[in-house]
UniProtKB/Swiss-Prot annotation:
Gene: hslV
Residues forming the catalytic site: 7
Top-level taxon of origin: Bacteria
GO molecular function: metal ion binding; threonine-type endopeptidase activity
Pfam families: Proteasome
Family: Belongs to the peptidase T1B family. HslV subfamily.
Subcellular location(s) per record: Cytoplasm
One Gene Ontology cellular component annotation held by this UniProt entry: proteasome core complex
Reactions mediated catalytically: ATP-dependent cleavage of peptide bonds with broad specificity
Quaternary structure, from the entry: A double ring-shaped homohexamer of HslV is capped on each side by a ring-shaped HslU homohexamer. The assembly of the HslU/HslV complex is dependent on binding of ATP.
Xref: Gene3D superfamilies: Glutamine Phosphoribosylpyrophosphate, subunit 1, domain 1
EC number: 3.4.25.2
Record organism: Dichelobacter nodosus (strain VCS1703A)
UniProt protein name: ATP-dependent protease subunit HslV
Amino acid sequence: MFDAHSTTILSVRRGNHVAIAGDGQVSLGQTIMKGNARKIRRLYHDQILAGFAGATADAFTLFELFEGKLEAQDGQLLRAAVEMAKEWRTDRSLRRLEAMLIVADRNNTLILSGNGDIVEPENSLAAIGSGGMYALAAARALYHNTEMDALSIAEKSLNIAADICIYTNHNIVSDELKDA
């Protein structure tokens, strides 16, 4: 696995909403190269949210590949993820990509790992990137101890992670699917 510096991505599912939030920092080694990167996207006719951690060029390659799989599978998230994982494991160039994705539709949230694995979180929260575990811990506390909505939990948790992780900043970009 790779050392995923320069990002934090968090997904929160609560009630009929799913939100994904990410910070805007891009680092090269110990240098901040950019502070306002957009690591969250909508895919397949705005029905799927996706966020990436890892090497930017690799992540865009994965976004493009995943979007193609979504089109081929008529927007079915689980089937598209399985098809992408199959290709990821058999294509030598894809196995060298250093990126991870969190993808979510109205029913499912998945983590697509850097080695072609598909992980479905056992609860309503998922995180990746260097600040992911800080954001996940904050999100768990907020999820279980407040009535905050999914988007508010995601944004607050990212801000907490940014206070702790040097590879995460406070330039938060978030999006949500309502009535998920």
